[in-house]
Amino acid sequence: MHCPFCGNDETKVLESRQVEEGTAVRRRRECERCARRFTTFEKFEDTPLIVVKKDGRREEFSRGKLKAGILRACEKRPVSIEQIETLVYEIEKGLRNGSEREVQSKAIGEAVMNALVHLDEVAYIRFASVYREFKDVQRFLEELHELVEKKSSR
């Protein structure tokens, strides 16, 4: 591993630990030449997950886009960043554990909605309004009515 400070390729590992539920390794390293310390991460590289958009375009799955959408829905809600990280991790894990290397964007949206409905109902409605492209107040009311019915049948 090259030192990011001086470029030397002689570094020693001071500490290693598993992170992200054992799917990655965090290593604390020290340069043999300049003695500066830095952190590296090793992660298993899987074949990319491809998202098929509504219009048929294909693009590589972006964990960042998934997280940004959930963060937007949970803005100013009593939802911790840890809960959001867990949600993103679980959704991504579910997508990657499937047998398909291509996934419809609709499946991702539904997975987010299924998770948000249990986490925070306001965040669920916010996400649904964008994902399902609510055009008017009536559509909001319909979704709220469905949510109340689901809640009362539990």
Curated annotation (Swiss-Prot):
One of its GO terms (biological process) is negative regulation of DNA-templated transcription. A zinc finger (unnamed) spans 3-34. One of its GO terms (molecular function) is zinc ion binding. Keywords: ATP-binding, DNA-binding, Metal-binding, Nucleotide-binding, Repressor, Transcription, Transcription regulation, Zinc, Zinc-finger. Binds 1 zinc ion. Signal peptide: none annotated. It comes from the Bacteria. It holds the Pfam family Zn_ribbon_NrdR. InterPro entries: ATP-cone_dom (IPR005144), NrdR-like_N (IPR055173), RNR_NrdR-like (IPR003796). Its cofactor is Zn(2+). PANTHER family: TRANSCRIPTIONAL REPRESSOR NRDR. This is Transcriptional repressor NrdR. It comes from Desulfitobacterium hafniense (strain Y51).
